[in-house]
Design a protein with these regions (language model features):
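Intrinsically disordered, low-complexity acidic Ser/Thr-rich regulatory segments
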Residues: 1-50, 60, 64-65, 93, ...
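Forkhead-associated
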Residues: 57, 61-99
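Amphipathic hydrophobic-ligand
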Residues: 52-54
Length: 112
């Protein structure tokens, strides 16, 4: 086996590609939910930025079908790489390799 395969998480993962979490890998297993925001009481991944709400969005992993559900709760918006702004409060299913922008283009994550 090559070393790249050995280092990849077994489930899904979220990769920080821009901003304070660039280069970080957050492992996800079936049903895991990650809450991103600026509030230490409302989020478990904290981004201190004027464009990030206290509870900005959640990302939930569905390992059975290999997709993620993203739900926006913010004022500034959660966007996909094609510029689509997610509808606030409505869960959106996104496939792996989707890039998600949190508030603005300065904070971006790729779901894998």
């Amino acid at each position: 086996m090559d070393s790249e395969r050995l280092n990849k998480p077994k489930g899904g993962y979220i990769e920080g590609i821009r901003g304070v979490y660039a280069g970080y890998i957050i492992e996800m297993e079936q049903g895991d939910e990650l809450t991103i925001g600026s509030s230490v009481t409302e989020a478990n991944l904290i981004i201190r930025n004027e464009h990030v709400s206290g509870r900005h969005c959640t990302i939930t992993y569905n390992g059975i079908v290999g997709s993620y559900t993203v739900t926006d709760f913010s004022k500034e918006g959660t966007y996909l790489s094609d510029g689509t702004r997610l509808s606030c409060g409505n869960p959106t299913i996104v496939p792996v390799n989707t890039i998600i922008y949190i508030g603005d283009i300065e904070n971006a994550f790729k779901v894998r």
